[in-house]
Amino acid sequence: MSTPTLVVVSGGPGTGKTTLAHELARVLGCPAIIRDEIKQGMVMSHPGYQSGGDDPLNHPTLDAFFGVLKVLLEVGVTVVAEAAFQDRLWRPNLEPLTGLAHLRVIRCTTDADIAHDRIIQRAKEDAHRAAHGDQELLDSIAAGGHSLDSFVPISLDVPTLTVDTAHGYQPALPDIAAFARASDDGASPERMMES
């Protein structure tokens, strides 16, 4: 069995991670495991759930997310995994998976104004987003307690590609897929994208 690839789609709130992860998984022909969707499923089995504060579902969600990834990688499934993946919270959980898969990181970025507008839009249109406290995030941003520019990306020494999601994808989806499919030969993402 050859080694599968774990494609990590990361970025701050409203940067287009989930949309890109689903599109990339479709192009690659593999599953997309979305952290927020796992939590939304947990919320469905907890009537009266309220997000915010010391959320009792955050740790079980994290455990389920990485548990599913581990099971898939152990049997050789290439997978796209999407979550914020801020360094201090997520790196300790990703590092053990590097022994099971080639790891590639995609960092979604966009202007703070665009991210803010996306958060407002999804909070209005998607009732499932209540599981994630989007309104609390917006309130914190408005009060100056949180900045969308405060995101700290994963600091792993693995091939990494930054994708601007402001207006479509830059680089384009076929190039992102080529990055995800590239062999784990130690080449820098920039060299892989030029070939």
Where are these regions (language model features)?
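Conserved substrate/cofactor phosphate-moiety recognition/catalytic segment
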Residues: 19-74
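Small-molecule kinase domains that catalyze NTP-dependent phosphoryl transfer to phosphate-bearing small molecules
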Residues: 124-174, 190-195
